[in-house]
Each structure stands twice: as C-alpha cells, then as structure tokens.
Amino acid sequence: KYLISLSVFDQQGMVKGGDLSRYNARVSTEMNVLPILRFGINANMSYTDQNNANTSLFSAQGFRPDLPIYNDNGEFDMSTGQANPVANTYKKNHDNIYRIMGTVYGEVDIWKGFRFRSSLSGNLQFTENNSFSPSFLSTRNEASGSEYHYKYSKTVFDNTLNYNYEFNKNHVLDAVAGISFERGISRSTRMNGQTYPDNDIYTNLGSAASISSWGNGYNASGLFSSFARINYKLMERYLFTFTGRYDGSSMFGSNNRYGFFP
C-alpha cells in the first residue's frame, strides 16, 4: 500500500509585503515482504516562500489623518515624528524555508505476541532570511540590510520490542521495552550591512559599504534512552500501568549526565 499527496497553499496578505506560499509533498508506503515481515517509508517535504509585512493595519489606523504621507518634493514625509505606515511597506523581510522529514522502519512478528520494530528518522531544515531597510527610513539616510542562514538536522534511531497477551478476555497484558538514540545539530550565521549604494540592490549584501556586525552559532546535543512500559487490564474495568526510563543527555549537567525517571 502507498500514499502520495501534493498540496499548495497561497495567501496574499491584507498589507503590502505580507504574503505566503507553501508547497508540500508527502509519500508513504508499506510493503509486506513476508507474512511476518514489513518495511515502510514515510517522507514529508515542504518549501515555504514568505514575505513578512513590516507594517500593519493597526499602524495605519493609528496614523494621524491630518499628517501627510508625502512632502512637497514627492518623497515620503518622515518629519512628523510618527512612523510612516506607507513608507514602512518598502522594508524587505523575506524567508525561504526548506524542510525534509522522513522515517524508514521495519517490523517483524517474532513469536506469539512478540513484535520487534526498528526505525530511523531524520529531520532536516534550511532557513534563509534577507531583510532590507531603504535609506529614506533612516535618520542618517543610509540603507541597511542583513542576511541570516540557519541549518538544523536531527536523527533518531529507535528499537522497540512489543508483547501483547490476552487470557480469557479478563486479563490483557501489553508491554513494550526499547532503546533510542537521538542526535541534533544546528548552525546559524548572520551578517548586517550598512550604507548601500542605492535602494535597488537590496539582495546583495556585498554591495554594502561596511559590514556592521556578524556572528555565527553552533549547537549539538545527544540523547540516549532505555525505557519500558507495562499495561495490565483486568476484566475490562481496571488498568494498571508501570513505566520507567533511563536517560543520558548532553543537556544534563556534566556531573549528572544520566537519570532514572519512573
């Protein structure tokens, strides 16, 4: 069996510069190799193209109606002491977001109620952001811009053993035990530029006269878990549950990396 789906979402904002387009694709399939053996794949991919509005209807409603939008020279009037809602629509703030999520798994029925499942999952995301503020919005009459790049990846490897047993319909036992490995890494870079030659070359940060600031970030984390759960149902009226897990995480303190959680 298999499933394939495609979807498109397109939204035009009520304010200039605020629109969103998203494209999604999904693939899901499962194959019965043997009566006791199954393999499957689930994958989701998406692309988001988003322009973030830098003004709102509230700012337009709050703008004094007796103040001019343009001065006598036909330029935006920035001398009123109030943010010009029309001028602010010329700010640029654009996102490109790519996401891929997928899982590959296998299941095998071992013997009389015992089932083993192993799965490998991945999550990958790329984000690009470009912003630009024209010179007429600056008190120093200088255009400024920035670029931001973000990458995130996560891998999860799960292995579980399930057991289900029913006796005389009055006793039902359901148990699971397993181990899990998880790894996540993120990287980011941001650069800010000042004094562009004009308001049209906003997509090229290298055209700025100076790089006012820059920075990058890196973060990595890991998690190892072993866990177990037992559910016992008596006469379809009473349910008893016993759980426990033992986790080791790089997010814990260096002197206490592991902990038991009943």
Model-derived regions: residue spans:
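Surface-exposed loop/interface segments of Gram-negative outer-membrane beta-barrel transport/assembly proteins
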Residues: K1, G13-G18, N24-M101, R117-S225, ...
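N-terminal capping/interface segment
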Residues: Y105-R115, S119-S121
